[in-house]
Amino acid sequence: FYWRGKALGGSSSVNAQIAIRGVPAAFDAWAEAGCEGWSAADVMPLFDAIEDDANYGTPGKRQGGPLPVWRMPEENWGAVDRALRDAARQAGYPVKPDLNAPEGEGLSCNPINLRHGLRVTTNDGYLEPARGRANLTIRGDALVDRVIFEGRRTVGVRVRFGTGAFEEIKGREVVLCAGAIHSPCILMRSGIGDAEALTALGIAVLHDAPAVGRHFMDHPILRASLALKPSFRAEGADARHTNCCLTYSSKLGGGGERDMIIIAYNHRGLAESGVAPNGGIGVALYDALSRGEVRLTSADPDEQPVVEENMLDHPADRLRMRDGVRRLAKLCTLSPIADITEAITFGESAL
């Protein structure tokens, strides 16, 4: 399975709420590759405008935007948060108070989209405040088959609501925002994609664009599982799973700035009793070079696509993840982490 959020707000309705900005150097690399308007100078002011940062916002900058950015006070961190913090300090990693500041790396608190203890999704931040507008209609339970073209001009979409029949809705503009999985699927069913693959599925080719659905990427994570001593186990519905993280630059395999992150997990899901016996600490590659693809299996929009992640396919990704696991293992041997656990395992192997 490749889990996605099927709701207004998409995957922001089910994700970890973590609100980490992209690294400025990465945006500049996009601009250098030809993505006009995506340099750090272009993008960072937009982050400033959409955020309402409870800790670092100032009038006119990172304050008053539709999406709250909040950090758990350290005195309320979980046991694994505190253990990772203290172990990282003991190992000599620097502290980075504001993870979203453009420069630096190190130990930080995860910023999250939260207000008054409640998740704030893109639906909450953008759509709900506009719900009462006379010129806005919101319709859910919709399945988009394809975009409708007149010649090479977009004029609408073919869509089904609930169990009804497919219908065509026309409009001056179509904004395609179905996520990393279904946006390319809609394009391919619309005839935009690899001509040979589309023809094999009986889809009329509008534009031969082999890159559609290709170059898929995601961040691999490997976790050390912590069997926590009873007094360090997370308890209660409000026990947040993660607050503490550690970013660093591997300087391996051509990786970019701040390409790696180590994340504390106070629990891996609460048990029915409300007490979680296990926590974890994960290391993740945030600048992956491996590429996969999203591929249609049918022209039928009810049929799910195949998602080939190809994680760790690139040798530089394997190099950096091996280094990351070694770093994580060293942190786990330090007393702040070792002292709160009964056992530490990587998969089926003991530390």
Predicted regions and their residues:
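FAD cofactor-binding and catalytic pocket of flavoenzymes
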Residues: 221-326
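Flavin-binding catalytic cores
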Residues: 204-206, 314-340
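Conserved redox-cofactor binding core of oxidoreductases
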Residues: 31-154, 160, 223-227, 235-236, ...
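Cytochrome P450 core scaffold surrounding the K-helix E-X-X-R motif
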Residues: 24-31, 149, 292-294, 304-307
